[in-house]
Structure formats: C-alpha cells, structure tokens
C-alpha cells in the first residue's frame, strides 16, 4: 500500500474516533471497524499481487476467495452509502471534511481492490 493510502486510512480512522455522533456512535464504531477490516484485506490482496506466484497459495488457503472478494465489495458499497448519508445529515464542517475524505478513500480503495483482483484472476 502506498504511503498516501496508509496515511489516509490512519487519518480518517483517527478523525472518526474523535467524532461524537450522539446515539449513532455505535454505528460510527461499526464503520471504523469495517474501515480497519477493509484496510487489512486490501493489504493482503496487494501482498498476493506482489508475489504473483502466491495466487495458488491464496486459493488453497481460502477456496472461496472470490466469494470473499464479492463480500468486500458489498461492504465497500455499504460504507459508501453510509458515508454519503452522513454527509447529507451533518452540519459540522469537521465531520463533513472527514466524511468527504472517507468517501474519496473508499472509492480509491475500491478501484485498487478491483485492479489487484483482476491481476490475480
């Protein structure tokens, strides 16, 4: 993962952890957890691509990796919709900036995961 993407994940996770969204803080914690999970998954795909011979290992280790990939895309789409919803309802500029950056990062990571997965197919 390039250093910009790593710092973007770290920055957004830090910003989200500082937000207090009242009754929806449980939802925010869920979003943070999914962001962290997405980062780990993206990193593991990148590592597999870097070691192209690792495709067989990836398939052997997880025979359902395509299903897992599909699930990650569903999670990304859910996060994108959740972030868009938060953008519409928040009036706090700190939160707006954070969610705009989160949305941009999600779109970038979705594209990276697509690129990695096509290289693995």
From Swiss-Prot:
One GO BP on record is:
exit of virus from host cell nucleus through nuclear pore
Q: Name one GO cellular component term.
A: virion component
Q: Motif Nuclear export signal: where? A: 12-21, 85-94
As for subcellular location, the record says:
Virion; Host nucleus
- Family matches, as Pfam families: Flu_NS2
Q: Is the Hydrolase keyword given for this protein?
A: no
Give the matching InterPro entries. Answer: Flu_NS2
Main location per the UniProt record:
virion
Q: How does it assemble?
A: Interacts with protein M1. May interact with host nucleoporin RAB/HRB and exportin XPO1/CRM1.
Write out the function statement from the record.
Answer: Mediates the nuclear export of encapsidated genomic RNAs (ribonucleoproteins, RNPs). Acts as an adapter between viral RNPs complexes and the nuclear export machinery of the cell. Possesses no intrinsic RNA-binding activity, but includes a C-terminal M1-binding domain. This domain is believed to allow recognition of RNPs bound to the protein M1.
Hey, which family's this protein in? Answer: Belongs to the influenza viruses NEP family.
The entry's protein name is Nuclear export protein
Gene symbol here is: NS
């Amino acid at each position: 993962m390039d250093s910009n993407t790593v710092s973007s994940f770290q920055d957004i996770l830090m910003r989200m952890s500082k937000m207090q969204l009242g009754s929806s803080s449980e939802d925010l914690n869920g979003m943070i957890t999914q962001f962290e999970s997405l980062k780990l998954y993206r990193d593991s795909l990148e590592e597999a691509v870097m070691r192209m011979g690792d495709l067989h290992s990836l398939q052997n280790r997880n025979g359902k990796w395509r299903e897992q990939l599909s699930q990650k895309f569903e999670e990304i789409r859910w996060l994108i919709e959740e972030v868009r919803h938060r953008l519409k309802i928040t009036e706090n500029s700190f939160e707006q900036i954070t969610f705009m950056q989160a949305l941009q990062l999600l779109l970038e990571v979705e594209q990276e995961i697509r690129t990695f997965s096509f290289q693995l197919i």
